Amino acid sequence: MDALQESPPSHHSLPSALPSATGGNGTVATMHNPFERPLEGIAPWNFTMLAALMGTITALSLGENFAVIVVTARFRQLRQPLNYVLVNLAAADLLVSAIGGSVSFFTNIKGYFFLGVHACVLEGFAVTYFGVVALWSLALLAFERYFVICRPLGNFRLQSKHAVLGLAVVWVFSLACTLPPVLGWSSYRPSMIGTTCEPNWYSGELHDHTFILMFFSTCFIFPLAVIFFSYGKLIQKLKKASETQRGLESTRRAEQQVTRMVVVMILAFLVCWMPYATFSIVVTACPTIHLDPLLAAVPAFFSKTATVYNPVIYIFMNKQFRDCFVQVLPCKGLKKVSATQTAGAQDTEHTASVNTQSPGNRHNIALAAGSLRFTGAVAPSPATGVVEPTMSAAGSMGAPPNKSTAPCQQQGQQQQQQGTPIPAITHVQPLLTHSESVSKICPV
């Protein structure tokens, strides 16, 4: 370690001493080795507070994201293409907490990064890598929702292979953005407070500046632009649909609720990553700036809190997932209540159905009035001419065909052969079974 201290830092090695900074009580911290002792000028209770905060965040995140993975693995109806990215988000957040959260908890208890240089590089890379995967998963989720609802490619439908390909691109692209510091383009080094490791924001070297600019562009500006574009197009689509059904209050309510949910998603993204991005740009632009180490630690803690509220916003607010989650709880009373509510929802839950017609096709966008649950397309069956619900983006399926509907289906087929148009259901209505839908479209 002495040799490490004496050797001059280079862009291929991790510097052993942090620059001097103003301490929490106004004193100036001298050059110190973050792998051997705590930063001078910071009271021990500050590290204890940070350890308690990280312990709480880590425990909540591990529990929530592990529950998401277990429930999705147990219930087949949740394993749909649009849900793949949600499971990927949970897995990335789980890894951030398991590695970054747990390491930060123990290092804050000690007051310094006692694990050594190589562990610092590994922790900095792993947390940054999995954090970027989670960040790009949010952008991919927004794009997939835009793709499913707005249908920019017409009848092209999102399938499992497309969802898996999108996730593979996210992981490979994130690796390409976070691996360079390990290979020599910039570096991972201890933070100013000395208990976590991160990209080298503080260097004035050109190669460090170029990496930070690349990282900022590809891991903040680009995904944020994808999120704004996708949700902007989605809201625009819903507003147009609402204008075509001006007399339907439920349609307007569904549109307003979806808009509010989108605003919450974007604000959550900005609250998580804007402090980190702002801090990185300020420190990179002014490497000689003196910041309080505790203040400099805030952006990193903000980014780690996303592992707690991401599952709440994107997963637990989904009614279908909540119902499945309750089924794995040990409390039998909750299971019975959930089963009753789920059965009753068939008759009480309303959707705002938006009809968009194209030659040879009719598509419906059903917005559940309680969550961002998009049911994909509702189109006439080629065999019967009957409007049947197809696989929804949330994973729900229409009820199986009923033999009692055979005469009506034959009547619908005859009407289709004669060129008689079959109306689509475009008004606000309760969710119907297959038999009820058929009886409404072609009454006997």
UniProtKB/Swiss-Prot annotation:
Pineal gland. CDD domains: 7tmA_VA_opsin. The lineage of its organism: Eukaryota, Metazoa, Chordata, Craniata, Vertebrata. A lipid is attached at C331 (S-palmitoyl cysteine). One of its GO terms (molecular function) is photoreceptor activity. The keyword Phosphoprotein applies. Residues 1-20, 341-360, 388-420 are annotated as: Disordered. Residues 7-20, 409-419 have a biased composition (Low complexity). One of its GO terms (cellular component) is membrane. It is a multi-pass membrane protein. It comes from Petromyzon marinus (Sea lamprey). The modification N6-(retinylidene)lysine is found at K304. Pfam families: 7tm_1 (PF00001). PANTHER family: OPSIN. Residues 72-83, 144-162, 239-260, 318-444 are cytoplasmic. This is Pineal opsin. Belongs to the G-protein coupled receptor 1 family. Opsin subfamily. The chain crosses the membrane at residues 47-71, 84-108, 124-143, 163-186, 211-238, 261-284, 293-317. PROSITE patterns: G_PROTEIN_RECEP_F1_1, G_PROTEIN_RECEP_F1_2, OPSIN. Residues 1-46, 109-123, 187-210, 285-292 are extracellular. Phosphorylated on some or all of the serine and threonine residues present in the C-terminal region. GO terms for biological process: phototransduction; visual perception.
